[in-house]
């Protein structure tokens, strides 16, 4: 049994280099919600050194809201924005001896793409036109998974052990009760059950089937790094191997 562990990096949390010792895939902010050229280069260099798959983490151009505010943009704007951010990270990766192997949208762009086919299609078109061997990390069972596969891209289905789920498989919005789970023991147990049982219990008690191919480890918060180490250790103890997913395995 195996799983991919991913983390969002280059967002100013200060633990990027240490997190790269624990994950197999890195989603690197491309400057539109956080980060910038130097942060991108640092994260890419560390990822190359540690053998971690490099991924772009594009967002809406919204640093004021950390990319978490929903936007109603034309599909052409979304396409161009994703391609622009991909190109920036790819140039840095090439200079450092690496390559962009996957794309994971950030924040509102991620959530809107999960349910809005117009946005999902714009994202996957940009990825496909950039490099059709690049994988797309998307919320498990979401419309972005479908859109990626419809154009022949590898879709890697992502789950979150520390986020609340609705019965339809979507995430509970951050401002609503039950959105974030802060009991580390419960999150740890949930991580293992998601991998083993391929399902998650929604906030209303229903069980939602899902295809857990990659799990996001959040790197922000005062105890995030220590907890990430606990999760990695628990996976090792359970005999679950950690490997990069998608194009990075090719």
UniProtKB/Swiss-Prot annotation:
Family the entry assigns: Belongs to the LamB/PxpA family.
Top-level class of the enzyme under EC nomenclature: hydrolase
Keyword ATP-binding belongs to the record: yes
Function of the molecule: Catalyzes the cleavage of 5-oxoproline to form L-glutamate coupled to the hydrolysis of ATP to ADP and inorganic phosphate.
Pfam families: LamB_YcsF
UniProtKB keywords: ATP-binding, Hydrolase, Nucleotide-binding
One Gene Ontology term from the biological process aspect of the record: carbohydrate metabolic process
MF term (GO), any: ATP binding
EC nos: 3.5.2.9
Organism placement in taxonomy: Bacteria, Pseudomonadati, Pseudomonadota, Betaproteobacteria, Burkholderiales
Subunit architecture: Forms a complex composed of PxpA, PxpB and PxpC.
Protein name according to UniProt: 5-oxoprolinase subunit A
Reaction catalysis annotation: 5-oxo-L-proline + ATP + 2 H2O = L-glutamate + ADP + phosphate + H(+)
Gene3D superfamilies, A to Z: Glycoside hydrolase/deacetylase
UniProt cross-references to NCBIfam families, sorted A to Z: PRK05406.1-3, PRK05406.1-4, PRK05406.1-5
């Amino acid at each position: 049994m195996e799983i991919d562990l991913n983390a969002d990096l280059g967002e100013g949390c200060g633990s990027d280099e240490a997190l790269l010792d624990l994950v197999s895939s890195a989603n690197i902010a491309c400057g539109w919600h956080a980060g910038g050229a130097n942060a991108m280069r640092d994260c890419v260099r560390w990822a190359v050194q540690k053998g971690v798959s490099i991924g772009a983490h594009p967002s809406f151009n919204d640093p004021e809201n950390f990319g978490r505010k929903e936007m109603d943009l034309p599909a052409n704007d979304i396409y161009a924005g994703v391609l622009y951010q991909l190109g920036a990270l790819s140039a840095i990766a090439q200079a450092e001896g690496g390559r962009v192997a996957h794309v994971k949208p950030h924040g509102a762009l991620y959530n809107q793409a999960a349910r809005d086919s117009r946005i999902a299609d714009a994202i996957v078109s940009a990825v496909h036109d950039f490099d059709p061997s690049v994988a797309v990390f998307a919320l498990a069972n979401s419309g972005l998974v479908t859109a990626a596969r419809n154009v022949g891209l590898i879709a890697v289905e992502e789950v979150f052990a520390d986020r609340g789920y609705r019965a339809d498989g979507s995430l509970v919005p951050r401002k609503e009760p039950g959105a974030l789970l802060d009991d580390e023991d419960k999150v740890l147990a949930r991580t293992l059950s998601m991998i083993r049982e391929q399902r998650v219990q929604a906030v209303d008690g229903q069980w939602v089937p899902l295809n857990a191919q990659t799990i996001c480890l959040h790197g922000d918060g005062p105890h995030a790094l220590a907890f990430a180490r606990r999760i990695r250790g628990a996976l090792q103890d359970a005999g679950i191997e950690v490997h990069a997913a998608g194009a990075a395995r090719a």
